[in-house]
Amino acid sequence: MRLRLIAVGSRMPRWVEEGWQEYVKRLPAELSLELVEIPLNTRGKNADVARLIRQEGEAMLARVQPGERVVTLEVEGRPWSTEQLARELDRWRLDARTVNLMVGGPEGLAPEVCARSEQRWSLSPLTLPHPLVRILVGEQIYRAWTVLSGHPYHK
């Protein structure tokens, strides 16, 4: 099974990369979790933010192949418990399609990305810093896998 986190923003602090890698390396070989970084467009004082978001969205969608599943991470999405995420992960595995988890930039996702989404997932009603979201997603995917495999990590 292949999961891909497509996130706007690059050049994260070292602790973010280390946190992400910690959970990626714990996953079994049959569950691949890849990070794809989309460069954040420069936001100047007079920037056309809508245009920048649209460009970032186009870059995100360019990484998605036809037939692949798109899941957006949005505050307005549906919150999943660990057990619900485990059920989704199992469903995705049986579906046998690559799953793309989409995380937008500071202003969120482009409407085109949201329109392509098959599912909308909310990590929290809180506004979370994007570097932390990467680690949180990695940990939650690992935790969901441990639920499915009977591993004692999730008790």
UniProtKB/Swiss-Prot annotation:
EC number: 2.1.1.177
GO MF annotation list: rRNA (pseudouridine-N3-)-methyltransferase activity
SUPFAM superfamilies attached to this UniProt entry: alpha/beta knot
Positions that bind S-adenosyl-L-methionine: 73, 104, 123-128
Catalytic activity: pseudouridine(1915) in 23S rRNA + S-adenosyl-L-methionine = N(3)-methylpseudouridine(1915) in 23S rRNA + S-adenosyl-L-homocysteine + H(+)
Gene3D superfamilies with a match to the protein in the record: 3.40.1280.10
Name of the top EC class for this enzyme: transferase
Keyword Chloroplast among record annotations: no
Record-linked PANTHER family: METHYLTRANSFERASE (PTHR33603), RIBOSOMAL RNA LARGE SUBUNIT METHYLTRANSFERASE H (PTHR33603:SF1)
Protein name, as recorded: Ribosomal RNA large subunit methyltransferase H
